[in-house]
Amino acid sequence: MREGKKRPFAINVWRWGLLILLLVLWEIGARLKWIDPFFFSSPLEIARTAVIKWQGGTLWRDIAYTGASTLLGFVLGTVIGSVVGLLFWFSRPVAQVAEPWMIVLNALPKLALAPVLVIWFGIGFLSKVILAFLMTVVVAAMSAYSGVRTADPALETLMVSLGARRMQIFTRLIVPSAMPSIITGLRVNIALAMAGSIVGEFIASDRGLGRMIVYAGTTFDLKLVWVGVTVLSILSVLMYASVVLLEKVLMRHWHGAVTE
């Protein structure tokens, strides 16, 4: 037991240790001119620039804008896609017709639609949410439908023989069977939603971390570019960690409901 508890702690120490070592080497390399400080800047200069932008009020507004569009697109895409995937159980012929189209839609380069969406819906918040939604909705539907197909046919037959209605079978067998697939798909979807939101900001936007990176690049402000990349990386890690935590809570609740 002690070895099992020490192992995650040791792994975390190594992770943070390697990150700190990388930052120290980066700072030393920039100061000693081993690397060009104009192109690569340095951790301390990036931190100073970030503080200035935060105090000016622009950085936190860009973080809030990108975070909100990502989360809204993620939630809408996951919920609507999961509901669609679950409802396919009520009509197998419809599901069989829709499945190849879902595969085709999932394979389409949806990020290529970003310029079209910006033209249709403008450079504001809505186009970013829609792009994040499109990135996630098909994946969520396919995850839910694959979970539906894992339901035990013998249990379904038994419930029918005992007089269970279709809605009872759906809520007590189909939905619980699909939940693990739906929950597992959350990790993939949060990354896709973030990618959709950022690409939308790259194309055209009045706010957001993506817009900040593009603006900094066009003005050759590479310190600000690194600020945007760093903050975006931190935001991505925080969102992913939150989804992993949510996944654990939902799985624990689901297992508890099944055992009851």
Residue ranges of predicted features:
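Short helix-to-coil transition segments within interhelical loops
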Residues: L108, V148-A154, L158-A178, T218
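Periplasmic/extracellular loop-to-transmembrane helix junction in inner-membrane transport proteins
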Residues: R2-P8, L32-V75
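Generic hydrophobic transmembrane alpha-helix motif, especially the helices
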Residues: M102-V139, S146-G147
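N-terminal signal-anchor/first transmembrane alpha helix
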Residues: M1-A30
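Transmembrane-helix boundary motif in ABC transporter permease subunits
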Residues: L72-M102
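Glycine-rich helix-loop "coupling/hinge" segments at transmembrane-helix boundaries
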Residues: V118-W120, A195-L232, M251-E260
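Transmembrane alpha-helices
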Residues: I130-L134, R166-G200, W226
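C-terminal transmembrane helix and the adjacent membrane-cytosol boundary/short C-terminal tail
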Residues: R92, R149, P180, W226-E260
